[in-house]
């Protein structure tokens, strides 16, 4: 795929991914105001399995259609449920089966929104696509860089780190230069149906269901012991897949005899023994790591790592930038942090930045303890 040269908006056909939310609604409106030939596309990525419409797809489609009618553009629909199942959901299940905590939104962006949707839009004759993500792009000669969104509270570059520069070059991000209150104000000013709609949270295909109830439909639970760091068995877990590093709620071990009143946290998942290791206190030493190992690194554009490089990183969404040194290893990459990192979680993504430029990232394989463990 060759990167397009941005041309006269009046001669540029843009198809906007319309989610039924306020961000994509305002994105379409702004592009119209900038003079682009704009159309919308609503994509359905999950087939409801029991008629209860957990994903609210019907409501979202109605909202997207109402917005398109209001601003006077055509709305296409496309079903990418098969692609989502094959390229996102099956990987999601495999990761949980392996005892890790994946982030399906990152794969969804790479495989669905910036691949299946992009390819489909181009087949419809689009020159570019647009989304409501809070990120920006910068064209630098032959490359297109991915930049953080200007609103630090909404920046979504963490979720787009696995999208290639060529795909970014085919995409416009109209709200990336705005803050969320500005976006809602624009929507209200123009009477858009989504102006006051709540932002979607959580994973689409789970919706309002309890996560454990959803997961056990696909993966058999394997109960096991809950142990302290000293090896004392203090309870039972229903399955390691239901727990993540740093988790406090839902352990069912409060009020133990001779224990302090401090809350319990998940410190480690011993996959070999199917044991959940817990400890008390938000500052428990086992919660902190000095470094991590990462694999499946995906760079937005080529990155030279012939020698260790000083960068910043995020090990979770909305985390502040953390200074680190990134180096190649025989099996992947190692990031050593200047400060202790709390609850570094295998299966989640680490994303690297050089200033406001999102360079890319990868999957956390393991965390190195900040202090030695007995």
UniProtKB/Swiss-Prot annotation:
<keyword id="KW-0820">tRNA-binding</keyword>
<feature type="binding site">
    <location>
        <position position="132"/>
    </location>
    <ligand>
        <name>ATP</name>
    </ligand>
</feature>
<dbReference type="Pfam" id="PF03054">
    <property type="entry name" value="tRNA_Me_trans"/>
</dbReference>
<feature type="region of interest" description="Interaction with tRNA">
    <location>
        <begin position="316"/>
        <end position="317"/>
    </location>
</feature>
<keyword id="KW-0808">Transferase</keyword>
<dbReference type="InterPro" id="IPR004506">
    <property type="entry name" value="MnmA-like"/>
</dbReference>
<keyword id="KW-0067">ATP-binding</keyword>
<feature type="binding site">
    <location>
        <position position="43"/>
    </location>
    <ligand>
        <name>ATP</name>
    </ligand>
</feature>
<feature type="region of interest" description="Interaction with target base in tRNA">
    <location>
        <begin position="103"/>
        <end position="105"/>
    </location>
</feature>
<feature type="active site" description="Nucleophile">
    <location>
        <position position="108"/>
    </location>
</feature>
<dbReference type="GO" id="GO:0005524">
    <property type="term" value="F:ATP binding"/>
</dbReference>
<dbReference type="InterPro" id="IPR014729">
    <property type="entry name" value="Rossmann-like_a/b/a_fold"/>
</dbReference>
<comment type="function">
    <text>Catalyzes the 2-thiolation of uridine at the wobble position (U34) of tRNA, leading to the formation of s(2)U34.</text>
</comment>
<feature type="active site" description="Cysteine persulfide intermediate">
    <location>
        <position position="204"/>
    </location>
</feature>
<dbReference type="InterPro" id="IPR023382">
    <property type="entry name" value="MnmA-like_central_sf"/>
</dbReference>
<dbReference type="GO" id="GO:0000049">
    <property type="term" value="F:tRNA binding"/>
</dbReference>
<keyword id="KW-0963">Cytoplasm</keyword>
<dbReference type="GO" id="GO:0005737">
    <property type="term" value="C:cytoplasm"/>
</dbReference>
<feature type="site" description="Interaction with tRNA">
    <location>
        <position position="133"/>
    </location>
</feature>
<feature type="disulfide bond" description="Alternate">
    <location>
        <begin position="108"/>
        <end position="204"/>
    </location>
</feature>
<dbReference type="Pfam" id="PF20258">
    <property type="entry name" value="tRNA_Me_trans_C"/>
</dbReference>
<keyword id="KW-1015">Disulfide bond</keyword>
<dbReference type="GO" id="GO:0002143">
    <property type="term" value="P:tRNA wobble position uridine thiolation"/>
</dbReference>
<feature type="region of interest" description="Interaction with tRNA">
    <location>
        <begin position="154"/>
        <end position="156"/>
    </location>
</feature>
<keyword id="KW-0819">tRNA processing</keyword>
<keyword id="KW-0547">Nucleotide-binding</keyword>
<dbReference type="Pfam" id="PF20259">
    <property type="entry name" value="tRNA_Me_trans_M"/>
</dbReference>
<dbReference type="InterPro" id="IPR046885">
    <property type="entry name" value="MnmA-like_C"/>
</dbReference>
<dbReference type="InterPro" id="IPR046884">
    <property type="entry name" value="MnmA-like_central"/>
</dbReference>
<protein>
    <recommendedName>
        <fullName>tRNA-specific 2-thiouridylase MnmA</fullName>
        <ecNumber>2.8.1.13</ecNumber>
    </recommendedName>
</protein>
<keyword id="KW-0694">RNA-binding</keyword>
<feature type="binding site">
    <location>
        <begin position="17"/>
        <end position="24"/>
    </location>
    <ligand>
        <name>ATP</name>
    </ligand>
</feature>
<feature type="site" description="Interaction with tRNA">
    <location>
        <position position="348"/>
    </location>
</feature>
<dbReference type="GO" id="GO:0103016">
    <property type="term" value="F:tRNA-uridine 2-sulfurtransferase activity"/>
</dbReference>
<comment type="similarity">
    <text>Belongs to the MnmA/TRMU family.</text>
</comment>
């Amino acid at each position: 795929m060759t990167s397009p040269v941005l041309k006269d908006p009046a001669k540029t056909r843009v198809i906007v991914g319309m989610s039924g939310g306020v961000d994509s609604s305002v994105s379409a409106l702004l592009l119209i105001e900038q003079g682009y030939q704009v159309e919308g596309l609503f994509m359905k990525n999950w087939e409801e399995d029991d008629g209860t419409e957990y994903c609210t797809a019907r409501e979202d489609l109605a909202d997207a259609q109402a917005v398109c009618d209001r601003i006077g553009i055509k709305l296409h629909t496309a079903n990418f449920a098969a692609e989502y199942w094959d390229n996102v959901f099956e990987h999601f299940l495999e990761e949980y089966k392996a005892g890790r905590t994946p982030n399906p939104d990152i794969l969804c962006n790479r495989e669905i929104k910036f691949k299946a949707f992009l390819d489909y839009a181009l087949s419809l004759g689009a020159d570019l696509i647009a989304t409501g993500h809070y990120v920006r792009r910068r064209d630098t000669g032959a490359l297109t860089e991915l930049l953080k969104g200007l609103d630090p509270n909404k920046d979504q570059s963490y979720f787009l780190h696995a999208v290639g520069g060529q795909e970014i070059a085919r995409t416009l991000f109209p709200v990336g230069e705005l803050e969320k209150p500005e976006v809602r104000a624009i929507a209200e000013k123009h009477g858009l149906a989504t102006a006051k709609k709540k932002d979607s949270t959580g994973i689409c295909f789970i919706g309002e269901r309890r996560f454990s109830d959803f997961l056990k439909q696909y993966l058999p639970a394997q109960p096991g012991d809950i142990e302290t760091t000293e090896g004392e068995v203090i309870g039972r877990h229903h399955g390691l897949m239901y727990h993540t590093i740093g988790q406090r709620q839902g352990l069912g071990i409060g009020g133990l005899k001779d224990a302090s009143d401090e809350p319990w946290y998940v410190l480690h998942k011993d996959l070999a023994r199917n044991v959940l290791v817990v400890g008390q206190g938000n500052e428990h030493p086992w919660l902190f790591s000095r470094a991590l190992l990462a694999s499946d690194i995906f760079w937005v554009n080529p990155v030279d790592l012939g020698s260790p490089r000083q960068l910043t990183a995020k090990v979770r969404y909305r985390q502040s930038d953390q200074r680190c040194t990134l180096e190649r290893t025989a099996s992947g990459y190692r990031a050593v942090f200047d400060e202790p990192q709390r609850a570094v979680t295998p299966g989640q993504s680490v994303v690297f930045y050089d200033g406001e430029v999102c360079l890319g990232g990868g999957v956390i394989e393991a965390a190195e303890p900040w202090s030695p463990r007995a």
